[in-house]
Amino acid sequence: MELTQNNLQARGLIFNHETLGLQYVKLINGHATVNGGAIYNEGVSTDKSAGYVSAQNVIFQNNTASQGAVIYSELPRFHLYQTILRDNKATGSDQSILLYSAIAFNDDSTSGNASSRLYGLKNSTIFNNTGYITNVRDGMIINNITMIRNNAGFYLQAPKGDAYVSNSIISENGSKNCVFADGDKTQFINNLTKTSDCGSGNSTDPNIEIGSNTLLAGELEGKCNAAPAEGLLCPYYLPEKQFLGFFKPRLLMSYQTLSDSLIVNRGRVLSDGTNITSLSSCESVDQRGKTRSTKELCDIGAIELVIDADSISPVGQDILYGETAKFSIADQLADGELLPASECESLLGKREDGKAWQAGCLQIVQTNTPSKGTLTLDQEGNVTYVPNGNWHGSDEFKLRVMTTITRFSDSIGNRYIDIPGKIVQDPPNDFESKKVKTGGGSFGYGMLIALLGLVGLRRFKK
């Protein structure tokens, strides 16, 4: 469902005073002249009369307001999970904020609100917005988000120290990723950011300094520069048949081990090594719904890199005699990128046939047919298949490739993923359609109906 508006009014798309649950919704082009561009959430009591907003798999885009361009909430009673915030604008002149809480929880309820994990922002992607993202108050948890390339970062005002920002990527958000109100005691745990902006964080799980590392392998959106290009994240990308896009983490060719990554395996499922109920533990699944391991260190940010064989779909093409098949395997690499051909010899030695390695250290494994063509693969995952003549039938095989993720496997056999492939070749279709003439002369529609009537009689006659 998509909610949108273009006309000006005091409040935006939704005015809420109850419990509002949103799933698989786009809230776009909301506008309020003052507060609440997309949602105005009313209620200053913590009892059942106060409004509460829960949003999962929701896109907030192009919403504007002086304050609370996405949500204006009288209390911080909102929970955004697996959600996209992009291109929204808080237009106020002083401390304008996208997710704005007018007042804090009272002292008696604050700690309970934090431990309930019901309020805050998790497993979400936030980019290209204008204004502070949220004013972080006591009782809120910000966890496993990717927040980059916004006009401003967080405005932090949690004097009791019962607010948490953890396991997140917070980078290149205006002049400062974090601005602290007087007396703020927000706890920062295990975030990738500029520590000069957001502090060193918790002594046990401190923040990670991003330093001079290139953030994106390409532009803000679109194509990801192929390995060995630098860039901690791929640009924002919306896969086919998906609702939410994301910035995918990358394992760079300069990494010798997984521990060299600033993102992968840097979050903690068990923050202190023992207590899974810790407020700083990773979310159990990522923004896409993919499970984060409960036995190993997880990835910080909204996306967990997962080698999921079940997510690999068959590739291929149907062609006619004289044609060449062209298709891509870029979306079938199980979160990885093809290993550059220049790296293959050092890992595997020379090819047995003496030919040069292709991208991904490609191996073609025939399945149900002998080889009937020649296949080439470039670094970006584009495949060109040239058949050996005009044969009629199929060529079935597996493309066995090594990726920037699988190269870290201890076993050579586990360093490959298999992508099923099939080329079907047919002769040109020279059949010409023959049309029955039903007009002109005495044999027309009337006679045709009469014949159909006889057919009916024969069918039911006994």
Regions found by a protein language model. Give the residues of each.
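Extracellular beta-strand-rich solenoid/capping regions of secreted or surface-exposed proteins
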Residues: 1-23, 31-46, 73
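Predominantly extracellular beta-rich ligand-binding scaffolds that present long acidic/polar faces
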Residues: 7, 21-24, 41, 57-61, ...
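Active-site and glycan-interaction determinants of carbohydrate-active enzymes
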Residues: 253-297
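C-terminal edge beta-strand
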Residues: 298, 303, 405-434
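Proline-enriched interdomain boundary motifs that mark the N-terminal boundary
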Residues: 307-315
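Surface-exposed or secretory-pathway low-complexity segments enriched in glycine-proline
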Residues: 332-381
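A short beta-strand micro-motif common to beta-rich folds, especially ectodomain repeats
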Residues: 391-406
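A cross-kingdom C-terminal cell-surface attachment/processing module
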Residues: 444-461
